[in-house]
Amino acid sequence: MANRLKEKYLNEVVPALTEKFNYTSVMAVPKVDKIVLNMGVGDAVSNAKNLEKAAAELALISGQKPLITKAKKSIAGFRLREGVAIGAKVTLRGQRMYEFLDKLVTVSLPRVRDFHGVPTKSFDGRGNYTLGVKEQLIFPEINFDNVDKVRGLDIVIVTTANTDEESRELLTGLGMPFAK
C-alpha cells in the first residue's frame, strides 16, 4: 500500500519540479532522503530515568526504537563525562518517513500554539531542513496525562536537493506550511 504523501510526490510534485527547474531526468528531481528525530536529554546525566522516558516517547512518535546517543567528550562545565548517555535519535526512511512527514504536516504542526508557519531560514545551504519543536505534546501519540516533563526535539529533513530553493519547493509541494 503506497502512502498518500508518496503518491502526491510522484503524481504532483515531480511534474511541478521538473517543469520549474527543467530537469532532464526523473532521477534528477529532488526527493526526501531521510528524516532524523533527535531528542537531547541534558538532565539524563543526573537522572537516567529521564532518558528512558524520552526514548519511550520518541519511540511512540516515530514508530521505531530510538538509538541512545552518548557524549563524545567530557565537558566539566556541564558535569558531563565521555560515554555517558545524553540523548536519543531515530532515523526514518521509506514508508515510515512518508507516514511521519504526512502526520507532521497535517496533524502535529497545526497543533502548535500560535502557529504561523515554519521558518524559511532553517535550510542549511545544501537542501536540508531543520525544525525545532518545543514540546512533544503536539504529536497525537503522546498522552498528555502520562507526560512528566515537556521535552523538545529536533527534526531534520534530509533531501537530495542541491540548493535551498529546490528543497523549499519540494517541501512546499509536500504540504510543509512555511511562514509567509
Swiss-Prot record:
UniProt GO cellular component terms: ribonucleoprotein complex; ribosome
Taxonomic superkingdom: Bacteria
GO BP: translation
Keyword tags: Ribonucleoprotein, Ribosomal protein, RNA-binding, rRNA-binding, tRNA-binding
GO molecular function, a single term: structural constituent of ribosome
Alphabetical list of InterPro entries matching this protein: Ribosomal_uL5, Ribosomal_uL5_bac-type, Ribosomal_uL5_C, Ribosomal_uL5_CS, Ribosomal_uL5_dom_sf, Ribosomal_uL5_N
UniProt entry tagged with the keyword Membrane: no
One Pfam short name: Ribosomal_L5
SUPFAM superfamilies xref list: RL5-like
Function description: This is one of the proteins that bind and probably mediate the attachment of the 5S RNA into the large ribosomal subunit, where it forms part of the central protuberance. In the 70S ribosome it contacts protein S13 of the 30S subunit (bridge B1b), connecting the 2 subunits; this bridge is implicated in subunit movement. Contacts the P site tRNA; the 5S rRNA and some of its associated proteins might help stabilize positioning of ribosome-bound tRNAs.
Oligomeric form and interacting partners: Part of the 50S ribosomal subunit; part of the 5S rRNA/L5/L18/L25 subcomplex. Contacts the 5S rRNA and the P site tRNA. Forms a bridge to the 30S subunit in the 70S ribosome.
Family, similarity comment: Belongs to the universal ribosomal protein uL5 family.
The name this protein goes by in its record: Large ribosomal subunit protein uL5
